[in-house]
Amino acid sequence: MAKATKEEKIILITNDDGITSPGIKNLVEAVKGLGKIIVVAPDKPQSGMGHAITIGSPLRMNKVDLFNGIEAWQTSGTPVDCVKLAVDKILHRKPDICLSGINHGANHSINVIYSGTMSAAMEASIEGIPSIGFSLLDYRYEADMEPSRKIVHIIVSKIMAQKKIDKHLLLNVNIPSIPYKEIKGIKICKQAYAKYDEAFDERVDPQGKKYFWLTGEFKNFDKGRDTDVWALQHNSVSVVPVQFDLTNYTLKKHLEKTISFK
């Protein structure tokens, strides 16, 4: 299993688009030279899996040679399974940082809830591993990843250069799909309040059986200039600090005054 020298920093890389996706290959290229890279990713696309884990069926993993000599493992599980397996079965110590992506498609605003990319990063954060999820606003398999590679390198190198990194650091980074020279900067944001106006399109398959296909339109209700959606619409990279503590502290204080009793 993977081992690094005591001085060597370990970079765990995963994703939800699968181990053969262009996104993860570009993520690996972006951080070469920053530490010992270990790739653990799903053997097939797992988009939209959220924080799902595999229960009641076996998990399998095997070593693959897909990254020019960099140690890599593919698993039959979800993105979160990949992180769990990496920490428990592959690495001899916790990685110094976990990077997830580069996702093909946006994970801003409400997307973070459904995202396998961000759930993998969140799982690592729960384990006390600083983590970053990267997404490009381009769903195409042939998307131009060169600008993303540059942004990834800038952000990761700055984070890893810090003397002490918060072990629960969790960042959701989204990158506009434009040439690098057109990117106006990196903006620290809050998550926009947005959702999908969803509908299930009813269809019939060749056997005459009814099935449903999820469709929908993205709607942003938050027009503030401090949101990830606004930053991306104005050609900036959005960086949202995220946390796995879902407690609503404002409501908690209110409820303590209204319904709490001893």
Residue ranges and their predicted role:
Residues 4-6, 162-166, 170, 176-262:
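C-terminal accessory domains and tails appended to enzymatic cores
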Residues 97:
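Short, Asp-centered acidic motifs that coordinate Mg2+ and/or phosphate
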Residues 13-20, 111-112:
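Short, glycine-rich nucleotide/cofactor-binding loops
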Residues 14, 40-42, 100-103, 134-135, ...:
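Short beta-strand segments
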Residues 106-115:
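Glycine/threonine-rich flexible loop motifs
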Residues 86-92, 119-130:
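Alpha-helix C-terminal capping segments
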Residues 2-11, 22-89, 93-94:
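A cross-family phosphate/adenosyl-ligand binding-site feature
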Residues 132-158:
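Short, glycine-/small-residue-rich phosphate/pyrophosphate-handling segment
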